[in-house]
Amino acid sequence: MSELTTIEQNNLQDLTSQLGAGGQGSVNIIMPELKINYDDDEGLTLGSIFVKEDKNDTNFFYTKTVTFRPISQMHQYSIYSATENKVTCKSRLISDFFEEAKDTKGTLRCGKPTSKEMREMPEDQRKKFSDIKNQRQLRGLVSFTGKNVQGEEKTYENYPVLIRLNGQNNYQVDKAADKIFAPFEQQYLKKVPRGSSMWNFNVNITTEKRKNALKKSYFTYEYEPDFKNQLPMEKDLYDTIMMIKEIIDGENNYVDGQYYKALKGETYDADAVATLNDLHESLDADYEDVA
């Protein structure tokens, strides 16, 4: 891998803020997804981790631990209709909550009030917005060797993936402190040494089994960072960063277009949204609230 040019080095500071690591592009670049296994057929281990390479992929290679090099952390609001099996509204991908989360219906946050407004509402009023979800999206490079149900092995080395964090994988409640926290931020992002970016380090990811109030089991990702070994910025990583930027810019350009159409009173293009979401796998499991 070659070293970066001076121009590319100078671009990194701006990219750090744009990618949430401290846009015009094509939405047709679809990243494989890192997922948690909830299927125990054929002797599969619940809670194991695998990569779904595309929407038609069924030959998965499972492991208990992966090494992940984070590149981007973004947030997105959405409304998912289980009956229609599609996303009916979604916001721009935002790197923090100071950004305006314009959405495809011409509102902000798919109509969800601000956190402050939600806290001040009575419980019955908050429930009206329960279908509006906030998803944390991590993009980066994963490395691991896994086995499929036939016992065959496959090695992924610095393989670009998307991780969707919903429900308890996005936010949890610290009952002792009576505070909400984000596991990825608490276990990794807030510990990144000053002056570094999230992509300067690897983090080992495992899963932990938990139970909700209804005694239903689910799994959360657990993060163990490796801050002893700072990773260099090289050409291959820079190219991946630019690809991710293109994905984010393309998504946001699309949402912005729908936002301004809605403001002008033009018909919301639900079919176009459905077509776009067909490029991703079905989101019924991704948007299920496991809390």
PLM features per residue range, with description:
Residues Q137-Q230:
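Extended serine/threonine-enriched, polar tracts that run as long, contiguous segments within proteins
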